[in-house]
Swiss-Prot record:
The record marks 325 as: Transition state stabilizer. One of its GO terms (cellular component) is chloroplast. It comes from Hydrophyllum virginianum. This is Ribulose bisphosphate carboxylase large chain. Its EC number is 4.1.1.39.
Length: 467
């Protein structure tokens, strides 16, 4: 036998294997790699495969105690990125045995935990993951999913309407509950805690939950519709988070909320499991996502974070609006909307989808459009997102000149008008403004909203665009 040979050798000698044929059980990753000057793309891709699986910087004698061919990641293909200098898409295959079953935390720790600080790379971005069906089946996924949520709420054939209570910080619990009641009474399906509403000196969580529950039940009694408020259970530790979720269940409310990136995947999966066992819907906010996903050449694309959330568990997740104040190019946004909702998604590079993904009946997640949207956006939102979505107007409800309830009425009327027009075969993209103006004739609340927001636009170039 050759025996152990100490020393450093190029990664590509072991981890670049263009002849490798991927297996149905492999986790496949597409990385956007920007090598340092003088580093060949094959070496950069192999380094990513090595450092995110079994490799380290030097040969170690314990390599001989295992079967590296069975466990190593492999860079099996490299494509140059069109229009970009010294950028490549490196495709890496990971054997399934490298990952703990049912753990998004372990999956990310392995694939992106260490390699992003690697000196041989100027920048690195995880663009997409293919999760094999064998691994998908180890996850519970969303607590309930789209169909079960509609059945619980008894609401069909239209998007759901929400509103984030503003100002997000500073209201007392009683005033907060009053704002919730006004919005729900006016016709919204949900109201929402903002992502940073946890348990602060001006409003402790228990007081907020009590006043919001009162608002929910009072508005339900008046409207005959099932209502909800996303009670944010995010906390400084898992025990406190679960205490808040348990209290929400004891109050009999239908939904709680979690900030899944700041709270962490372990906490999120724990909460999602509790929600399924106890009949609570789970709304997910993606606070901190732009720190990770906004730069085009470094970080993790949101389509990966969206897939991870579907595995970890959540019934709603914020997905961008295309038309509002926050980043979101149309094709890119629609690519992760289908990855959240559909059961089988074909590879489609025109939308940035690198791999075919089969979710094998894992429940779907409702995308939430939220951020700088108002009644004039309603036709575009209905056309872009379709029925299985939540359209969330914070300032677009609470900023109504007549108050919260009329703001909610304006949103509900504009939504119903757009859905009816679509069902009659009208073109929302072309006739949207006319549809809204027609509805204004029989809704003074909508007419007032249209007057306030007729000139508001957010016209900036998206940072994250398709190649």
């Amino acid at each position: 036998s050759v025996g152990f040979k100490a020393g450093v050798k190029e990664y590509k000698l072991t981890y670049y294997t263009p002849e490798y044929e991927t297996k149905d059980t492999d986790i496949l990753a597409a990385f956007r790699v920007s090598p340092q000057p003088g580093v060949p793309p094959e070496e950069a891709g192999a380094a990513v495969a090595a450092e995110s699986s079994t490799g380290t910087w030097t040969t170690v004698w314990t390599d001989g105690l295992t079967n590296l061919d069975r466990y190593k990641g492999r860079c099996y293909h490299i494509d140059p990125v069109l229009g970009e200098e010294d950028q490549y898409i490196a495709y890496v295959a990971y054997p399934l045995d490298l990952f703990e079953e049912g753990s998004v935390t372990n999956m990310f720790t392995s694939i992106v935990g260490n390699v992003f600080g690697f000196k041989a790379l100027r920048a690195l971005r995880l663009e997409d993951l293919r999760i094999p069906t064998a691994y998908v089946k180890t996850f519970q996924g969303p607590p309930h999913g789209i169909q079960v949520e509609r059945d619980k709420l008894n609401k069909y054939g239209r998007p759901l309407l929400g509103c984030t209570i503003k100002p997000k910080l500073g209201l007392s619990a009683k005033n907060y509950g009053r704002a919730v009641y006004e919005c729900l009474r006016g016709g919204l399906d949900f109201t929402k805690d903002d992502e940073n509403v946890n348990s602060q000196p001006f409003m402790r969580w228990r007081d907020r939950l009590l006043f919001c529950a009162e608002a929910i039940f009072k508005s339900q009694a008046e409207t005959g519709e099932i209502k909800g408020h996303y009670l944010n259970a995010t906390a400084g530790n898992c025990e406190e988070m679960m205490k808040r979720a348990v209290f929400a269940r004891e109050l009999g409310v239908p939904i709680v909320m979690h900030d899944y990136l700041t709270g962490g995947f372990t906490a999120n999966t724990t909460l999602a499991s509790y929600c399924r066992d106890n009949g609570l819907l789970l709304h997910i906010h993606r606070a901190m996502h732009a720190v990770i996903d906004r730069q085009k050449n470094h970080g993790i694309h949101f389509r990966v974070l969206a897939k991870a959330l579907r595995m970890s568990g959540g019934d709603h997740i914020h997905s961008g609006t295309v038309v509002g104040k926050l980043e979101g190019e149309r094709n890119i946004t629609l690519s992760f909307v289908v990855l959240l909702r559909d059961d089988y998604i074909e590879k489609d590079r025109s939308r940035g989808i690198f791999f075919t993904q089969d979710w094998v009946s894992l429940p779907g997640v409702l995308p939430v459009a939220s951020g700088g949207i108002h009644v004039w956006h309603m036709p575009a939102l209905v056309e872009i997102f379709g029925d299985d979505s939540v359209l969330q107007f914070g300032g677009g409800t609470l900023g109504h000149p007549w108050g919260n309830a009329p703001g909610a009425v304006a949103n509900r009327v504009s939504l119903e008008a757009c859905v009816q027009a679509r069902n009659e075969g009208r073109d929302l993209a072309r006739e949207g403004n006319d549809i809204i103006r027609e509805a204004c004739k029989w809704s003074p609340e909508l007419a007032a909203a249209c007057e306030v927001w007729k000139e508001i636009k957010f016209e900036f170039t998206d940072m994250d665009t398709l190649d």
